[in-house]
C-alpha cells in the first residue's frame, strides 16, 4: 500500500499536481487538475456572464444534494466552455479537474463503471469540480441493439448515468453537439449553457 501511495505521489508530481490528499490520490490517474490562471479574461457576452453567475448561485444553493449540480456546456470547439468552467470553479472556490475520458473508458467489461465510480467518490471526498470534456464519449446516445456488444454498451451508459445522478458534487459536461448526448442525460441536467460560435 505504501508503494502504491508513493507511486501516486510521483504520478501527481509528474502531472504537475501538488502533493494530493488521500481522495486526490484516486483522481490522479483519471483526471488532471486545471491550474487556475492568474487572471481569466471572460470572452463571453454579457447574457452568458449572467447565466454563469446564475449557475454558480444554483450550485451554491444545491449544496451536496445528489444529482442537483450537473451542468451542460454545449458549443463548438474554441467557444469558451473550458474557460467558463474555470470561472465557475473560481467563483465556487473549488479546484477544477478535467476528466480524461481515454483513461476512464476501458475495453474490459466492468472497468469503465469501476473507474467512474472511483472518480466520483474521490471528487466528492476532495470537494472538487469535475469537467467531462467531450462528455458524449462517456454519455453518448444509446444505440439500437443489434448484438450483445450494443446491449452491453447501452447498459453501461445507463449505469454511468445513474452514477452521475448520485454524485454529490459539481459535474460540468462539455460537448460540441448536445444532440450526441443521451436523452436520459439531458433530463438529469439542471443547468444548460450554450456557447454560440465566433
Locations of regions flagged by a protein language model:
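Compositionally biased, charge-rich terminal segments
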Residues: 1-6
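Conserved ASCE P-loop NTPase core motifs with emphasis on AAA+ ATPases
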Residues: 7-42, 46, 56-57, 136
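Walker A/P-loop NTP-binding motif of AAA+ ATPase domains
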Residues: 42-198
